[in-house]
């Protein structure tokens, strides 16, 4: 019930119920594709280094990058010593998907009316997955749900109702937390290597290697089961 204290009445929300009729079956399915919007466009290492040199010279300071550095960034000839990373493009998917299915059956006889529904939702996250992982580095959410509403006409004035509902929710998250996306947005493109020549992950103090965070930080996987039952008795008191 919404708006109990309002001046214009209330809004009463009730669950769907069966009706006296032949069985009516309804199946609905949807498949959607989602893409992120308003992602920042990052400079490449060459433009970043060139503009940083220009900014330093504008305030009378010595440029940070030499002509050799600029040439290495421009040509990409030495990716380990002069990396050029596009964290957002490399680590986020362009498109992710969501599936949703819902099946309902309703009907009834003069004695019993029924409404039965089942649903399934699967929504995938936006992070890339990698072959060197022994777990899924992406995030996802799954939900399986069911509902059964039964109304029995015990007598002409007595209705006995049973409402059963349940759902299973499954969540999978990588363990990098909010630092992961912050690193993608804030780190300069030449700040670190994803992977060093010896196979170790690149990194510096006070910085998160977003590739390593996705690949090796681990994951959280949780399941939640919910079941609800409501029993009702409606007796008309006609005198």
Question: For each predicted feature, which ranges?
Answer:
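Membrane-proximal, glycine/serine-rich, low-complexity loop/turn segments characteristic
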Residues: 2-234, 238
């Amino acid at each position: 019930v919404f708006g109990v204290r309002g001046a214009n009445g209330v809004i009463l929300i009730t669950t769907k119920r069966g009706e006296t009729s032949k069985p009516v079956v309804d199946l609905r399915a949807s498949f959607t594709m989602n893409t992120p919007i308003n992602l920042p466009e990052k400079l490449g290492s060459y433009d970043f280094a060139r503009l940083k040199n220009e900014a330093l010279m504008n305030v009378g300071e010595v440029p940070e990058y030499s002509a050799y550095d600029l040439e290495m960034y421009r040509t990409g000839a030495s990716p380990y010593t002069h990396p050029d990373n596009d964290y957002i493009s490399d680590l986020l998917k362009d498109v992710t998907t969501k599936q949703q299915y819902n099946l309902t059956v309703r009907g009834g006889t003069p004695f019993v009316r029924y409404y039965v529904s089942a649903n399934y939702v699967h929504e995938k996250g936006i992070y890339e997955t990698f072959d060197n992982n022994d777990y899924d580095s992406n995030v996802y959410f799954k939900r399986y749900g069911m509902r059964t509403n039964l109304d029995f006409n015990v007598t002409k004035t007595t209705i006995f109702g049973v409402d059963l509902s349940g759902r299973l929710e499954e969540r999978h998250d990588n363990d990098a937390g909010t630092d992961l996306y912050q690193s993608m947005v804030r780190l300069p493109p030449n700040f670190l290597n994803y992977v060093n020549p010896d196979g170790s992950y690149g990194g510096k103090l006070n910085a998160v290697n977003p590739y390593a965070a996705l690949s090796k930080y681990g994951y959280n996987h949780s399941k939640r089961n919910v079941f609800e039952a409501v029993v009702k008795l409606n007796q008309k008191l006609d005198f």
